[in-house]
């Protein structure tokens, strides 16, 4: 995540994170929604916090760069 956020070659707004969202099932946020990446949570501008263990997939554009096995 830090690579996409801080490296000048990447546009962080193209990052998409899919995560388990109770009770909805799955939800997705973009890099533009992310305020801070903490040790255990990703904090959103909306005030929500996504625990790292609920993340199931990270994409950059259309490419899946990480998927939970």
Swiss-Prot record:
Organism the protein comes from: Archaeoglobus fulgidus (strain ATCC 49558 / DSM 4304 / JCM 9628 / NBRC 100126 / VC-16)
Name of the protein: UPF0248 protein AF_0420
Domain of life: Archaea
Family classification: Belongs to the UPF0248 family.
Xref: InterPro entries: MJ1316, UPF0248
Alphabetical list of HAMAP family matching this protein: UPF0248
């Amino acid at each position: 995540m830090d690579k996409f956020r801080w490296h000048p070659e990447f546009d962080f707004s193209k990052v998409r994170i899919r995560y388990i969202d109770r009770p909805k099932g799955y939800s997705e946020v973009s890099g533009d929604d992310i305020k801070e990446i903490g040790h255990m949570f990703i904090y959103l501008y909306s005030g929500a916090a996504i625990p790292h263990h609920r993340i199931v997939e990270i994409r950059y554009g259309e490419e899946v760069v990480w998927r939970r096995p």
